[in-house]
From Swiss-Prot:
Cited PANTHER family: ATP-DEPENDENT RNA AND DNA HELICASE, EXOSOME RNA HELICASE MTR4
UniProt signal peptide: none
One of the protein's GO biological processes: RNA catabolic process
GO function terms (MF aspect): ATP binding; hydrolase activity; RNA binding; RNA helicase activity
Binding-site residues, ATP: A147, H148, T149, S150, A151, G152, K153, T154
Name recorded for this polypeptide: mRNA transport homolog 4
Organism annotation: Caenorhabditis elegans
Alphabetically ordered keywords of this record: ATP-binding, Helicase, Hydrolase, Nucleotide-binding, Nucleus
Gene: mtr-4
InterPro entries: DEAD/DEAH_box_helicase_dom, EF_Hand_1_Ca_BS, Helicase_ATP-bd, Helicase_C-like, MTR4-like_stalk, MTR4_beta-barrel, P-loop_NTPase, RNA-DNA_Helicase
Family under the similarity heading: Belongs to the helicase family. SKI2 subfamily.
EC numbers: 3.6.4.-
Lineage: Eukaryota, Metazoa, Ecdysozoa, Nematoda, Chromadorea
Major subcellular location class: nucleus
Length: 1026
């Protein structure tokens, strides 16, 4: 066998952490008495709202504060335990009704509305859950309504509004996004007339009895103690499950905590598994009964199909009864293209929206259309894919001539408000031919006026096929007959994972129009093998729980400290995050008892000797890991990436043993434009008993040691390599055929036999010429550790493996117990309290608080800034950075605070680059102070979060350039540009208020001029809903 391979050894080829309590002397520390009085007046109503709530009081001494915190912890734990939940009988098995009762309240039966006219009548028969929710409102009790998309939750909202209007109270309807607020305003204004809108961008009829607003506006009103809140009877929270959003969920939590106990709240939510827990939390902090009306009944049942990419036809895997059909799922997986067909795709990167993807979508749309399945929403997780798929339907037309005319009429009416030049923008012109044929696109990169036009056309049935991203599923009432998913996976910023059941349910819920369809159809495209368990988890799994995303912000801390006597820990103790944490204590205690018993059961006399042995083994493993990490560096390994070389490879915890390199290539890192990655086409042996996909490592099971194995080609990065051999094989050309597989098996057997199962490795120093000091020390350390292990007393015991196993089991149990105890301690303590103290240190160091923690002028300025980074903006204001900038430069610099998309780095003029450098300098200073005060901040990451990608675009826009001119200078989507400019206008409004707080008329005028120059043309075209 010697002629089958060539064996050769290749020739030479600490910062000190400061805990500073004292604030620096600052001439701005003393707050003007008039401004101090105003700050107190702003918060008077907030304090009144919180009357008798935990945490309000004047505690000057640190010891008093600590005592209060400990008392609050005990109260919180007792309070949670005393929330009693009663079940209320309903006449419908599809509807459950529970009510959470706090300790100071008594359970009372809800009374029917006898002798009093209902606040509102409906021209249709109400569902059971709607009747129960209305009963709660008639009894003036807060209620959480948890039901599927399109189930009819809006009925509950309109009833609460009608009740308030009848009783001469004001009512607030709040939603998570401005687009939804605009749409709701239109709907409610048509019905009730006395309706206003407040979104930041637009304020209409602010004196109305019913106010529709974003949650951020509501929070601002609560912090400022708005007089309006005194007149409010009910607040309706639409899409309350949005509270689990990582970025903005905290805003919802703040508003609920700050809301007066006298105001009743109606929460509208998609189905959530922990609805009861949420109600218990609200009941505990508001000390009032909170009802939960829950239904998983879907008026229009769903039918779920899988379309295997590369196969023929679709397979019904879940029928309208909700039964998962295992046989059909197996058929669908068999319909997938075979793994062999996927092999050899190393040089064809799998990107969505390519020819293959387009053709599969085309097949599905044709099938849906021929089976009377229109209208249809096609969800894709990429904006570019949405457009590519829409363009691929170039030969399809779903609209009749009269419908084309109606589309043109709506389209022309929509864009009539635009200037003639804006009407000729490519995005405006290019969308019309698609719309006329009944095809639409909806994603964040579209201009708002186009998104709204498409929404209206879709709602009117004039767009039959809509390609949309996930955001279309949130809030907007746009049901369809059919929903299609172009993939079961999505990239979430860090991982290309399966979509969660909650995400699937939210989007799939758009299928099935109530009163029009007898069923909704959902089609899931699957392009790689998946297990039945994964499919069940996605299609039939539970919805995502409503988990708190509470976090402290400097704006929150400063606003709560504007009034003397306000304990900031009050909002922490009343957070849903704290409530959920306390709920874990009983389960933690139960686990602790179990683990302690397990530890006591071990009888192990040689524990100390085994501990030293394991420690040596761990040190050796760590040393070897560092050696291979250095060997894998491109400057060392690339010269040894030869076809046929054997490499040991691992993927996660799966060890594939020896793999054989076929070829490698260098590519740009998609996450870092300045970095490159090395992609190896590696042949590895896998277990062929189950389904597998070479492009999806998660489906591969190691098979090197199995008699029945298969060699396949798998693309992998060099960080999967764990050892580099000195052996190269002559790889058969026909590796994908049985004969080639047999020959490769023979080569590997011969190599293993020749070297006695010890295939030689390249020596890092002698062969790879890595002659660094670190490598020499690592090799010496490796030899020393190997010698100490050979002479260790425990290695000579016959039962050493069994003893080590027992030792590791005990150690794992000890680690588990310590982790449980640490978790309980963390849960028992006031969460975020340490972070709060650290944030206060930062604020004192930077001069926002005095030594007595009283707010000074700088802190009052920061209170005005909530739309972006309040600290950096305040630092720049107080250091005069904006003083020397002109209006356009000011706006351009502020754009760095609001632009979030990725784009090519712009070439900036010297003036813009200079002011950007000043921003970065302030960011580094704040990061430095934060780290010194134990608020850990990754300095480089923090600095790079201020994105200059649109600085030049904003500079041109504020100087009068047209939209058509600025879009030519960037690769950023038009919709993203408009969204950034609108968010920038929000920041400028706050900067005007901040300049007023400083009594700086010149800066105030500069920000006002920038805002005026910004607000024009298509960027601020009025919403079609208004």
């Amino acid at each position: 066998m010697a002629d089958l391979f060539d064996e050769f050894i290749e020739p030479g080829v600490k910062n000190e952490i400061m805990d500073v309590e004292e604030a620096p002397e600052n001439p701005m520390e003393k707050l003007d008495s008039a401004k101090k009085r105003q700050a107190r007046e702003d918060m008077t109503n907030l304090l009144a709202n919180m009357h008798n709530d935990v945490g309000v009081g004047n505690f000057d001494e640190a010891t008093s504060k600590r005592a209060r915190v400990e008392e609050e912890e005990e109260v919180e734990e007792a309070r949670m335990e005393n929330i009693i939940v009663h079940t209320i009988r309903t006449d419908n098995e599809n509807c459950t009704h529970e009510v959470a009762i706090p300790p100071n309240a008594e359970f009372a039966e809800l009374r029917e509305n006898s002798g009093t006219e209902p606040a509102k009548y409906y021209p249709f028969q109400l569902d059971a859950f709607q009747k129960q929710a209305i009963l709660c409102i008639d009894n003036n009790q807060s209620v959480l309504v948890s039901a599927h998309t399109s189930a009819g939750k809006t009925v509950v909202a309109t009833y609460a509004i009608a009740k308030c209007l009848r009783e001469k109270q004001r009512v607030i309807y709040t939603s998570p996004i401005k687009a939804l607020s605009n749409q709701k305003y239109r709907e409610l204004e048509e019905e009730f007339k006395d309706v206003g809108l407040m979104t930041g961008d637009v304020t209409l009829n602010p004196d109305a009895s019913c106010l529709v607003m974003t949650t951020e506006i509501l929070r601002s009103m609560l912090y400022r103690g708005s007089e309006i809140m005194k007149e409010v009877g009910w607040v309706v929270y639409d899409e309350i499950h949005y509270m689990r959003d990582k970025e903005r969920g905290v805003v919802w939590e703040e508003t609920i905590i700050l809301m007066s106990k006298n105001i009743k709240q109606a929460f509208l939510s998609a189905t959530i598994p922990n609805a009861r827990q949420f109600a218990q939390w609200v009941a505990s902090i508001k000390q009032q009964p909170v009802n939960v009306v829950y239904t998983d009944y879907r008026p229009t049942p769903l039918q779920h199909w899988i379309y295997p990419v590369g196969g023929e036809g679709m397979y019904e895997v879940v029928n309208v009864k909700g039964e998962f059909r295992e046989d059909k799922f197996r058929d669908a997986m068999s319909g997938l293209a075979t793994a062999g067909d996927s092999a050899g795709s190393f040089n064809k990167r799998r990107t969505g929206g390519g020819t293959q993807g387009d053709s599969n979508v085309l097949k599905i749309i044709r099938s849906v259309a021929s089976n009377d399945g229109l209208n249809c929403i096609v969800f894709s997780f990429s904006r570019k894919e949405c457009e590519s798929y829409a363009i691929s339907l170039k030969d399809m037309d779903f609209n009749k001539d009269h419908e084309k005319g109606m589309v043109k009429s709506v389209y022309e009416s929509a864009i009539a408000q635009l200037s003639p030049e804006d009407q000729k923008l490519p995005q405006i012109l290019n969308i019309l031919p698609l719309l006329r044929r009944g095809i639409g696109v909806h994603h964040s990169g579209l201009m708002p006026i186009l998104k709204e036009t498409i929404e209206i056309l879709f709602g009117e049935g004039l767009v039959k096929v809509l390609f949309a991203t996930e955001t279309f599923s949130m809030g907007l009432n746009m049901p369809a007959r059919t929903v299609v998913f172009t993939s079961a996976r999505k990239f979430d910023g860090s991982d290309n994972r399966y979509i969660t059941s909650g995400e699937y349910i939210q989007m799939a819920g758009r299928a099935g129009r109530r009163g029009k369809d007898d069923r909704g159809t959902v089609i899931l495209m699957v392009d790689s093998a998946m297990s039945a368990d994964d499919a069940k988890q996605i299609i039939k799994g539970a919805t995502d729980p409503l988990n708190s995303q509470f976090r402290l912000t400097y704006n929150m801390v400063l606003n709560l400290m504007r009034v003397e006597g306000m304990a900031v820990s009050w909002i922490i103790n009343n957070s849903f995050h704290q409530f959920q944490s306390y709920a874990k204590i009983p389960e933690i205690d139960k686990k602790c008892v179990q683990v302690e018993r397990k530890i006591a059961s071990f009888n192990f006399p040689w524990e100390n000797e085994m501990r030293t042995l394991v420690d040596l083994q761990d040190q050796l493993e760590a040393t070897r890991q560092r050696i291979i990490q250095i060997q894998r560096e491109p400057k060392y390994i690339v010269g040894f990436l030869h076809a046929g070389r054997l490499f040991k490879v691992k993927s996660g915890d799966r060890d594939f043993k020896w793999g054989i390199l076929n070829q490698f290539k260098k590519e740009q890192n998609p996450d870092d434009r300045n970095d490159q990655i090395y992609l190896c086409d590696m042949m590895i042996a896998i277990n062929t008993e189950g389904r597998f996909d070479p492009t999806n490592p998660a489906t591969l099971v190691p098979g090197f040691d199995l008699p029945k194995r298969r060699w396949i080609r798998v693309p992998m990065t060099i960080d999967r390599i764990t050892a580099i051999s000195a052996v190269r094989l002559k790889v058969p050309a026909d590796i994908d055929k049985p004969d080639g597989q047999m020959r490769l098996d023979g080569m590997m057997a011969a190599a293993t036999k020749r070297f006695g199962n010890q295939i030689p490795l390249l020596d890092p120093i002698q062969d790879m010429e890595i002659k660094t000091v670190e490598m020499k020390e690592l090799i010496a350390r490796e030899k020393s550790l190997e010698g100490r292990l050979e002479t260790h007393s425990m290695t000579k015991r016959d039962n050493m493996k069994d003893l080590k196993k027992q030792f590791e089991q005990k150690q794992d149990a000890v680690k588990e117990l310590n982790a449980l105890k640490a978790e309980r301690k963390s849960v028992q303590s006031t969460l975020h309290l340490e972070e709060l103290n650290n944030r206060k240190r930062v604020l004192r160091r930077l001069g926002y608080l005095g030594n007595d923690d009283a707010l000074v002028l700088k802190g009052s300025v920061a209170c005005e800034l909530s739309a972006s980074d309040e600290l950096i903006l305040t630092e720049m204001l107080l250091k005069g950075i904006f003083n020397t900038l002109d209006v356009a430069q000011t706006a351009a610099l502020l754009s760095c605070f609001v632009f979030q998309d990725k784009c090519a780095a712009p070439k900036l003029a010297t003036e813009l680059q200079t002011c950007l450098s000043e921003l970065h300098e302030q960011a580094r200073n704040v990061a430095k102070v934060s780290n010194e005060c134990k608020m850990e901040v990754m300095e480089d990451k923090y600095v790079s979060s201020f994105n200059p990608g649109l600085m030049d675009v904003v500079y041109q826009w504020v100087n009068g350039a047209t939209f058509s001119e600025i879009v030519k200078t960037t690769d950023v989507f038009e919709g993203s540009i408009i969204r950034t400019l609108r968010r920038l206008e929000e920041v400028l409004r706050e900067m005007i208020n901040a300049a007023k707080a400083l009594a700086n008329k010149e800066l105030e005028q500069k920000f006002e001029d920038a805002r005026k120059n910004l607000k024009r043309d298509i960027v601020f075209a009025a919403s079609l809903y208004l």
